[in-house]
């Protein structure tokens, strides 16, 4: 059922919503999941090797997706500024003692926030086949140069994630793979967080269903509300690339569509929160930030 709760914009300093009451844990949809590619990434030796590989990166070369405050008080500006409004963005969910799968961590701001809230976090990012989720462009069979630039940006995001991992003394894990065919040895999670990535995926349903098969308690999905042509509860997902040469924005997805997809995944007890977050358009940190309208759908299993 679609239930809506409104909050003030992030700039208005509204109090965060309280925790969402959790039902009793359920058994996952697929209690045993066959292992597939990209196996072994949770092994401590592999994680250590990943960290060491990123140690030589220069701070000035990082791309900061989220504004982040370091322990010494230094603030690193980012495309999004969620500081002080993390709970709203994450639907008011209680992460204490939970194993969390985070899809699309970018530079890791929410990774380490959830860890500070008591979660064990596994951050999942696109693998080397990132081009499968790029939009085709008329007249270009293989837009290699733009793909190369996009992959470099993603790689610098990963450098930033590992920099913060070391800075905060984190125990979070970082894995890569195909979001439509996740590694089978990731295990089962209490909570999955899907943070503003469905609009970038050619198959949002495929990604949600993959995550739901590994989740027992809660699905948290946050997306931008990109237009208001229809009521939020409308079950609509529009093909809506933002510009002819933009590679990654596929869809304008309404809360009602996310609600319906979660229901089909077995998480039909939902609550939707409308909110706003500070955002620099076109990833231009030098531009004036806007209050980007967002929504978060929290889904629990229906027994």
Can you annotate each of these PLM segments?
Residues 109-181:
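Class I SAM-dependent methyltransferase SAM/SAH-binding core
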Residues 101, 124-125, 222:
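The conserved SAM/SAH-binding core of class I Rossmann-like methyltransferase domains
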Residues 74-98:
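Conserved alpha-helix/loop element of class I SAM-dependent methyltransferases that forms part
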Residues 188-196:
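Short SAM/SAH-binding signature in class I
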Residues 154, 180-184, 193, 202-210, ...:
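S-adenosyl-L-methionine-dependent methyltransferase catalytic module, highlighting the catalytic core
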Residues 1-57:
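Membrane-proximal basic amphipathic "stem/tether" segments
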Residues 91, 181-188:
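Short amphipathic alpha-helix with an adjacent loop that forms part of the alpha/beta core around
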Residues 98-106:
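Conserved class I S-adenosyl-L-methionine
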């Amino acid at each position: 059922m679609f239930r809506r709760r409104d909050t003030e914009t992030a700039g208005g300093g509204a109090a965060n919503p309280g925790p969402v009451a959790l039902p009793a844990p359920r058994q996952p949809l697929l209690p045993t999941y066959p292992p597939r590619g990209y196996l072994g990434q949770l092994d401590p030796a592999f994680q250590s090797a990943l960290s060491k590989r990123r140690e030589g990166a220069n701070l000035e070369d990082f791309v900061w997706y989220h504004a982040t405050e370091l322990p010494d008080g230094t603030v690193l500006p980012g495309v999004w500024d969620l500081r002080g409004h993390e709970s709203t963005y994450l639907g008011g969910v209680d992460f204490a003692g939970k194993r969390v799968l985070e899809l699309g961590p970018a530079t890791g701001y929410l990774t380490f926030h959830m860890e500070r809230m008591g979660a064990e976090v596994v951050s999942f990012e696109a693998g080397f086949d990132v081009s499968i989720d790029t939009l085709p462009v008329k007249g270009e069979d293989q837009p290699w140069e733009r793909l190369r630039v996009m992959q470099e940006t993603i790689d610098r995001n990963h450098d930033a994630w590992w920099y913060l991992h070391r800075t905060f003394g984190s125990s979070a894990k970082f894995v890569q793979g195909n979001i439509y065919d996740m590694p089978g040895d990731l295990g089962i999670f209490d909570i999955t967080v899907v943070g503003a990535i469905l609009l970038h995926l050619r198959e949002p349903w495929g990604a949600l269903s993959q995550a739901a098969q590994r989740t027992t308690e809660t699905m948290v999905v946050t997306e931008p509300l990109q237009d208001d042509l229809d009521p939020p509860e409308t079950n609509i997902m529009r093909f809506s690339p933002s510009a002819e040469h933009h590679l990654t924005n596929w869809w304008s997805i309404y809360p009602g569509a996310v609600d319906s997809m979660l229901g089909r995944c077995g998480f039909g007890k939902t609550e939707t929160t409308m909110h706003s977050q500070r955002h620099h358009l076109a990833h231009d940190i030098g531009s004036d930030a806007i209050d980007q309208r967002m929504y978060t759908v929290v889904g629990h299993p229906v027994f």
